Amino acid sequence: MGKYNASMEHFGLALAGSVAARTVAAGLLLALAAGCADQQPSEQADTATAAAAPPPVPASSPDDTVTPVDNIDQATAAAGDLSLRQDAPLHYTVKKGDTLWGISNHFLRDAWQWPQLWYDNGQIKNPHLIYPGEVLTLVMVNGHPRVLLSEDRLHPRVHEMPLDQAIPAIPIDAIREFLRGPRVVDKDEIQHAPYVVEFTDEHVIAGQNSGVYVKDLPKNSAASWSVVKIGQPYIDPDSHETLGFEAIPTGEADLREYDKEVAEMMLTRSPQEVEIGNRLLPLEPESFKADFYPHPPAKPVEGRILSVYNGLSQITQYNIVAISRGSRDGLDPGTVLGIYQTARKVSDPYDDGKVALPEQKAGVLMVFKVTPRISYGLVMTETRPAHVLDKVRAPRSSSR
């Protein structure tokens, strides 16, 4: 890696070695056992290719000078706009159950600045993955505080490790139920989707192990389908554009007998009652990739909260929200946005008219699933009550 201070040896970093050694050491950071593999069909589906690329983590250079941090005051004095915590650890051992967001919060007041803090040599595939047992060390690189992977980790990374063993960016338990929940579809997708016309037992509703008749099922199509109820439209409160429709899963169905007019299917899963008129959509993959990390939006963006998963009225930490911006607006998994209460106007007690109150920051969310027009985010921090129609945009740095 270049010119390393001899005193680095007591950190066990061994960073001055060969390119191979640097490659092993650099395969780190912010993984996320959670990056959205359950993408939407048709226009809604192209999330991976449509999403803007996240800000690149600055790669190392052979000419970098890396020196140890003797005390945290030395690092914070050189942090500049980086919100390095006064109580940041000089070393941190990654534990099972950690998240990248949580680790970033150990070092930074603004966890979304992680790409500025992380030191990556960019020479291996998936350089932003961190695994339990690895040791992160705070150092100075060319006079600026950075965090890198120490050779003093508990379990040296000899071979490339599987994605699903890396720590996630966000707590997976907070979104697990949602991953089999609603999705966003457009009007054209709805109109061309097969639909339930009757039940084999002639009941008005059906559940698991019930037979259903389905019209317009494509020939040679998949054997298993998701059954959904079309819910509310998502409408941009500012432009009034219809962004899509909520498709709420009511069950899953397997093909029993195909007919070009009406196919017979069996409900293999039914979290809700299936009704005549419910539409069928292709099943979404259940895996949730771990390949994104917290970062600010790639370009200026402002939107609004459209809804809260499970219909809650007040938004708190680890609630899931739908927002009115998507991949076409530059959002991708890992994008961090600030939540700002909609400015209120109150009556002036001594003068006719209204007084506009200042906008207040209510929290921070991280996007974990995107469609072209709508994204879903997990509320990571909450400082004030937030509600539907509150604004979201790039977060303000606490160092300012």
Question: Residue locations for each model-derived region?
Answer:
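N-terminal secretory signal peptides that target proteins for export/translocation
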Residues: 1-19
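Surface-exposed, polar/charged interaction patches used for macromolecular assembly or partner binding
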Residues: 2, 37-400
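A detector of low-complexity, intrinsically disordered, Ser/Thr/Gly/Pro/Ala-rich segments
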Residues: 6, 21, 45-47
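Sec-dependent signal peptide hydrophobic core
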Residues: 20, 24-28
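C-terminal motif of bacterial Sec signal peptides marking the signal peptidase cleavage site
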Residues: 32-35
